[in-house]
Amino acid sequence: MTQTAQPDTVLIVDFGSQVTQLIARRVREAGVYCEIVPFQSADAGFKRLQPKAVILSGSPASTVDEGSPRAPQIIFDSGVPVFGICYGQQTMCMQLGGKVESGHHREFGRAFLDVNKDCALFEGLWSSGSRHQVWMSHGDRVTALPDGFEVVATSSNAPYAFIADEKRKYYGVQFHPEVVHTPDGAKLIGNFIHNIAGIKGDWSMSAYRAKAVQAIRDQVGDKRVICALSGGVDSSVAALLIHEAVGDQLTCILVDHGLMRKDEAANVVAMFSEHYNLHLLHVDASERFIGELEGVSDPETKRKIIGRLFIETFEEEAKKLGGADFLGQGTLYPDVIESVSFTGGPSVTIKSHHNVGGLPERMNMQLVEPLRELFKDEVRALGKELGLPDSFIGRHPFPGPGLAIRCPGGITREKLEILREADAIYLDEIRKAGLYDAIWQAFAVLLPVQTVGVMGDGRTYEFVCALRAVTSVDGMTADFYHYDMEFLGRAATRIINEVRGINRVVYDVTSKPPGTIEWE
């Protein structure tokens, strides 16, 4: 689905910063639609979107190097407000006649900003004479301002830390307002959008829903769509949105690989078939998957087998249905943003959904991706708008390869059943304790290790179960969840008493980094 020109849009020009997506998050949180466009195609992006405001991102590049990225001149000729962040501030200054030099003292981490002049961007937030914490990450710095600019705030190593040309509505900051380490950063971005650019902030999920439904109808017409439904939030929301648009022209296929959580496949089928009247084909392919996986211990080999078998199974079932012209996917915005190489051309790394990668080309289908403009939290909000229950929307992430990567070593049907039961008990205890929503992800792992135990009067030699729970904002970094010992004791006792095949339970206290959230 292609975003057409809309009056209240913010264009974010990406110069390759690792935190550009955070800028987009802050703009969306302010109720305003935005798009990230790499600097190489920013000229075309500006003409396509006709934005009400532009934000220039940071970059690992240096403005003083020959051939470093620049913003297209059309931005400065257009008269729209511009907000330059870090590198964005520096290139704006250079392009408008100022100077930038490599800093004598690099500034990374927390810094303090001294406000020495009132500014329209500070309204209701900062005032002259106040001091505020910000987050710096720069080596270069502005040393001479273009005509029309003035300094409104400084830091110890950045005499031009916050600059403004109030007449042209150009603002530049040396720090990063988009990160949480700048406490007032989101409000500054909000002030720029609402007060300076005059954008109302009325972009909502209900408005997006109506626009997306119409776009799907325009794209699909009277043709057929098939959608791979995994039971996850992304594919489920995409399927419901497509179904709302084209009704019975959509058929969903749930490939049950035998690696799902306890009763998960049955619950997904019941919810979508009974409550949403969605045409859903449930394919039990567990014998096929587990048969090929049995005895395979290398995690990457497991993933490849699962991916290959999924494509083969999905393709076979789709052909039985007579094929379709369109394939529905739950692709999200972070998956389609182009990564930027500031030393050459754009490096486009569009990820394929782990389950359906390669399918559109193999089956000669066009993609329908109604979520490709949304972040994960926005997809959850849209799911709520579509009527999905909170218990479903708020589910913890679950990997595509399923329990196969939570069973290190060789896989057998027996080990999967042991793990499935232990995992269900663990999650049940978490819900009973009221902890589910406080945890990003929690699951059990069945280790390829057996230990001696004593149950009753008998000796046992059974598997070890590891419990994992982490807190996180985005899954990129994570900390282990700090349970009290009473909870862990209760969960361990239930698992050992109720699951035949486990006689020892341990808790994983590894953070990410150095570990990963999943064990494989």
From Swiss-Prot:
Residue span(s) of domain GMPS ATP-PPase: 203-395
Catalytic activity field: XMP + L-glutamine + ATP + H2O = GMP + L-glutamate + AMP + diphosphate + 2 H(+)
Enzyme nomenclature, EC number: 6.3.5.2
Assigned GO CC terms: cytosol
Positions of the Glutamine amidotransferase type-1 domain: 9-202
Binding-site residues, ATP: 230-236
Cited InterPro entries: Class_I_gatase-like, GATASE, GMP_synth_C, GMP_synth_GATase, GMP_synthase, GMPS_ATP_PPase_dom, Rossmann-like_a/b/a_fold
Keywords: ATP-binding, Glutamine amidotransferase, GMP biosynthesis, Ligase, Nucleotide-binding, Purine biosynthesis
Associated pathway: Purine metabolism; GMP biosynthesis; GMP from XMP (L-Gln route): step 1/1
Residues annotated as catalytic: 86 (nucleophile), 176, 178
GO molecular function, one term: ATP binding
Pfam families (UniProt xref): GATase (PF00117), GMP_synt_C (PF00958), tRNA_Me_trans (PF03054)
Record's function text: Catalyzes the synthesis of GMP from XMP.
Subunit structure: Homodimer.
The protein's name in its UniProt record: GMP synthase [glutamine-hydrolyzing]
Organism, scientific name: Rhizobium rhizogenes (strain K84 / ATCC BAA-868)
